[in-house]
């Protein structure tokens, strides 16, 4: 068929290869043909439409059955709810067009999870993308959320559950938000006060006071999961309070808390200051778990498609650089200064290289203590939503897969990861295990029901 037949027609089959044999793939074929036709704008839109439909329906038979069932107009309306199709068409038409808003403010919390965002300023990634970005150090997550919602920040470093919570109106007014990139995986730890070094069994923690960075954080959900698996009810047997990361070590030193599940360099700084020890890395709870994310409102994405693409591309390229272990010391020097993390370089190096003192007299070598994989797996979002539901933050029925698709923009990540020289996965969901228990993203309600300790009926 012609590469430009209507992808919203149930009668059309979308092939997977280049028809003329002169291009490496169908997308290149389509783009080249669009440039050669008399109406490139209209045909360019068709390229975008086909790309979107192929991403949503990898099996063409499923696309055709869907269109026969609901019709093209209903399909267009449904897709527009979670994908800015008009903005994508405009961005394609403009190509590497004018950046709508070159001067930006992006908020961040001074933790190593924000490494790709922070390093993009001193190491020139934003500048090479044609952007003048002011990365603004911010005190805590509630402030990040409020400043972003009030449009004081154009985009922000957020905890990966936050865009989901904001979109659903949990803890704030509902505003559609997006996560086009995960900032880091792993990179957190449970740290206890030195006085508790003989209490390594979580069943001994009854009555402990713990800090987490925010109510809507992977830290809160992992701590709750961990203690519940050891028989403690996180709402009744321990106390969990939200404390901004820059204040955690001081609270541990002052004996206001017994420990925290926190991002780095907070854990390593507690060891450096001699007030705490690292009980365990969160990678040993869930290997490869997401933590923080690059987030922007859907309004920003729609109104500034070229700016959004340039910003995300810069962060993806920084992420690709950060994935290589040989670059970690250079990155540590770039992000340690006072205007960024405000930490001794040795503390940041221990986190990024994975060779670190644990506070118990040992030097551990864990190269993937923190890593950087930007792909926003839909299954990550679904797991987070199950924990929101499990602990009573999310009420009523929820279409887990729909929310995941709307917020975690896997299609955008795939394209820009390729441009940055990374290899994105071929699927958007996967099974994984948390403390040995498999999570199937296709069965979220059964997963919630399987837990003995929960706040749901």
Residue ranges and their predicted role:
Residues 190-191, 293-296, 300-301:
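Short glycine- and hydrophobic/aromatic-rich loop-to-beta-strand nucleating segment
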Residues 74-87, 92-94, 126, 154-158:
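Glycine- and small hydrophobic-enriched segments that form the cores of compact globular domains
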Residues 303-409:
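Secondary-structure end/capping motifs
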Residues 1-62, 84-90:
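N-terminal secretory signal peptides
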Residues 52-78:
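N-terminal secretory signal peptides and thylakoid transit peptides that target proteins
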Residues 94-235, 239-242, 251-268, 274-288, ...:
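Short, glycine-/small- and polar/acidic-enriched structural segments
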Residues 153-155, 244-276, 297, 329, ...:
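Ligand-binding pocket segment of bilobal, Venus flytrap-like solute-binding proteins
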Residues 382-457:
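Conserved C-terminal helix/tail region of periplasmic/extracytoplasmic solute-binding proteins
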């Amino acid at each position: 068929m012609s590469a430009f037949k209507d992808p919203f027609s149930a009668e059309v089959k979308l092939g997977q290869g280049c028809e003329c044999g002169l291009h490496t793939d169908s997308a290149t074929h389509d783009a080249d043909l669009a440039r050669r036709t008399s109406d490139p704008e209209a045909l360019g839109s068709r390229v975008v439409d086909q790309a979107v439909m192929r991403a949503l329906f990898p099996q063409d038979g499923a696309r055709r059955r869907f269109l026969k069932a609901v019709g093209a107009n209903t399909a267009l309306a449904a897709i527009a709810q979670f994908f800015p199709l008009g903005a994508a068409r405009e961005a394609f038409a403009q190509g590497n067009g004018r950046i709508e808003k070159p001067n930006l403010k992006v908020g961040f919390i001074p933790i190593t999870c924000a490494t790709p965002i922070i390093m993009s300023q001193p190491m020139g990634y934003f500048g090479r993308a044609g952007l003048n970005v002011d990365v603004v150090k911010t005190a805590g997550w509630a402030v990040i959320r409020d400043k972003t919602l009030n449009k004081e920040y154009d985009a922000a470093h957020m905890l990966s559950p936050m865009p989901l919570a904001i979109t659903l109106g949990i803890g704030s007014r509902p505003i559609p938000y997006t996560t086009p990139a995960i900032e880091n995986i792993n990179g957190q730890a449970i740290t206890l006060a030195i006085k508790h070094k003989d209490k390594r069994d979580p069943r001994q923690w009854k009555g402990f006071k713990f800090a987490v960075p925010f109510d809507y954080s992977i830290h809160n959900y992992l701590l709750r999961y961990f203690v519940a698996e050891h028989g403690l009810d996180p709402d009744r047997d321990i106390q969990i309070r939200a404390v901004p990361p820059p204040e955690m070590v001081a609270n541990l030193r002052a004996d206001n808390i017994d420990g925290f599940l926190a991002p780095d360099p907070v854990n390593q700084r507690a060891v450096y200051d001699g007030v705490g020890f690292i009980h365990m890395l969160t990678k040993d709870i869930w290997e490869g778990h997401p933590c923080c994310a690059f987030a922007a409102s859907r309004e920003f994405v729609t109104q500034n498609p070229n700016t959004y693409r340039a910003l995300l591309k810069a962060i993806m390229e920084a992420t690709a650089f950060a994935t290589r272990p040989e670059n970690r010391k250079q990155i540590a020097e770039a992000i340690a200064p006072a205007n960024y993390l405000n930490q001794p370089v040795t503390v940041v190096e221990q986190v990024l290289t994975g060779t670190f003192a644990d506070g118990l007299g040992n030097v551990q070598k864990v190269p993937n203590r923190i890593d950087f994989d930007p792909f926003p797996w839909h299954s990550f979002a679904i797991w987070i939503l199950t924990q929101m539901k499990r602990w009573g933050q999310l009420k009523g029925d929820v279409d887990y897969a729909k929310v995941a698709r709307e917020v975690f923009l896997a299609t955008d990540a795939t394209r820009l990861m390729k441009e940055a020289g990374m290899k994105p996965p071929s699927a958007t969901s996967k099974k994984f295990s948390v403390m040995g228990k498999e999570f199937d993203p296709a069965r979220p309600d059964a997963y919630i029901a399987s837990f003995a300790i929960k706040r749901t009926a």
